A protein has these predicted regions:
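A short, N-terminal "cap"/entry segment at the start of jelly-roll beta-barrel domains
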Residues: 1-33
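Short histidine-centered beta-strand/loop micro-motifs
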Residues: 28, 46-52, 74, 93-95
Length: 109
């Protein structure tokens, strides 16, 4: 088992993200295949359109975000989550000019 307290974690910068900082709570080195991050998005924060070979789940803890695919749009509010399959393109923006906090689960195949 791995237990991580609220303020614990390693600070990281995510590629192709802007106006965001975060803490890696659990890494693949600890769990074998899963990384868990807590991301703090500023009011103008988000992520550029990209894809990844890894599965991802975004869970909105605070605020509101929009996750866009090439032909779809998902508005997520507190308590909502989205699953992103390997290879799916997506971008993300923060809504309403207010910060958002997102718990991110990344699973390596």
């Amino acid at each position: 088992m791995i237990s991580v307290k609220d303020a614990q974690g390693t600070q990281y910068e995510a590629a192709k993200h802007f106006e965001v900082y975060g803490l890696q709570k659990i890494t693949e080195a600890q769990s074998q295949r899963t990384t868990v991050c807590y991301s703090y998005f500023q009011p103008n924060g988000g992520a550029e359109m990209s894809s990844s070979p890894k599965e991802r789940v975004y869970y909105v803890v605070k605020g509101s975000i929009t996750v866009n695919g090439p032909e779809e749009k998902h508005v997520l509010n507190e308590g909502d989550l989205i699953y992103i399959a390997p290879g799916e393109e997506r971008d993300m923006v923060v809504n309403n000019g207010k910060p958002a906090e997102v718990l991110v689960f990344i699973v390596t195949p």
